[in-house]
Amino acid sequence: MRRIAVMGAAGRMGKALIEAARQAPGAGLTAAIGRPDSTLVGVDAGELAGQGRIGVSLSGELATVLDRFDVLIDFTHPTVTLKNLDICRRAGKAMVIGTTGFSADERRMLDEAAREIPIVFAANFSVGVNLCLKLLDTAARVLGDEVDIEIVEAHHRHKVDAPSGTALRMGEVVASALGRDLQKVAVYGREGQTGARTRETIGFATVRAGDIVGDHTVLFAAEGERVEITHKASSRMTFAKGAVRAALWLEGRDPALYDMQDVLGLR
């Protein structure tokens, strides 16, 4: 059995991860960690997730449960994830990271840690989204420079980073297929007298509203026709199941920085 720990276990995504780890053959939830100051520390993690008692209590510190798991799944905040990354690197524990909003310097810290431990890091763990990334690469290569490309994403009102990590990853895939540098061609939102659109631009638009789990659409717009590749998530379990799948896949892997394209065999 692959022993799995969930960071941020008292949150919405954490609860979904607990459920997914409980359901997956070959996986077992053996540790759950929340904030040190949480009043829920000590509560059974299964009860937190609506799964009934499972005999795993919520801990307030990762360091106190290092002997209870093989791989940590972390969907939290960059500051928290980087602290956990250092602990796992020192302890030789594998990680699955779904946290978004890392700076370029913070991304380099992931690269450095992956020299010592195996890590799956992805902006989105949905199988459908990762299939879309493959389709986007193909669409960009076929349609080339004859279309205008726009990326529109929508999430719930509580999401703190924009554009989403998934939207940015989609932009990276498209830009790479076209030989463009996303940092140079990306336009984030438009307002006022912007002037005519240039062909090489890749535009991003963001919506934050209600309880939207995650919608992403990439438009390839030409004269007379438009191709749209869309993914809509209706449940966090989509991401949770993908993360647990990645945790199982990591068993026996060499230290390296992997993503869901590796897990799904799409490379």
Swiss-Prot record:
GO terms for cellular component: cytosol. The active site is at 155 (proton donor/acceptor), 159 (proton donor). The keyword NAD applies. NADP(+) binds at residue 35. Its EC number is 1.17.1.8. (S)-2,3,4,5-tetrahydrodipicolinate binds at residues 156, 165-166. Keywords: Amino-acid biosynthesis, Cytoplasm, Diaminopimelate biosynthesis, Lysine biosynthesis, NAD, NADP, Oxidoreductase. Belongs to the DapB family. This is 4-hydroxy-tetrahydrodipicolinate reductase.
